């Protein structure tokens, strides 16, 4: 059985997880989240690999999304962070590669400042998860595994 790939993308300031506003985002670091997700994914299925990428630069995230089109990525889990609220370029990149994606936010963006309520990605995402803390990443990965089993890549 061929290996499927899920790409986990994290946007600006998420490299500061564990120390940045822990009352909102918790104390888990991005490295610990990635490691935990990888372990969890291995327990679900040996046939899916987790790829990870984080950048504070919009263009770097867009380049990585474009790369996903040719590197065998089957699904994307993305926490676009602040880019959620204004990045048409990120939206266009995600829709342009035709890879299903899940939008994740650690906090409940709808309980926060008004400017955080608008997402340029949500209407294009297969699913949107917010407010579950870092568990939201696990839920997104699990959804992707189920989706990939139901809809194999042609």
From Swiss-Prot:
EC number of this enzyme: 4.2.1.10
Q: Which InterPro entries match?
A: DHquinase_II, DHquinase_II_CS, DHquinase_II_sf
- Keywords per UniProt: Lyase, Quinate metabolism
What does the record give as its pathway? Aromatic compound metabolism; 3,4-dihydroxybenzoate biosynthesis; 3,4-dihydroxybenzoate from 3-dehydroquinate: step 1/2
Give the molecular function GO annotations: 3-dehydroquinate dehydratase activity
Signal sequence annotation: none
Name the residues that bind substrate.
Answer: 79, 85, 92, 106-107, 116
Annotated catalysed reactions: 3-dehydroquinate = 3-dehydroshikimate + H2O
Alphabetized Gene3D superfamilies for the sequence: Dehydroquinase, class II
- Active-site residues? 25, 105
Annotated site (Transition state stabilizer), which positions? 20
Biological process, per Gene Ontology: 3,4-dihydroxybenzoate biosynthetic process; quinate catabolic process
Tell me which family the UniProt entry assigns to this protein.
Answer: Belongs to the type-II 3-dehydroquinase family.
According to its UniProt entry, the function of this protein is described as:
Is involved in the catabolism of quinate. Allows the utilization of quinate as carbon source via the beta-ketoadipate pathway.
Q: What PANTHER family does the annotation carry?
A: CATABOLIC 3-DEHYDROQUINASE
Q: How does it assemble?
A: Homododecamer. Adopts a ring-like structure, composed of an arrangement of two hexameric rings stacked on top of one another.
Q: What is this protein called?
A: Catabolic 3-dehydroquinase
Q: Which gene encodes it?
A: qutE
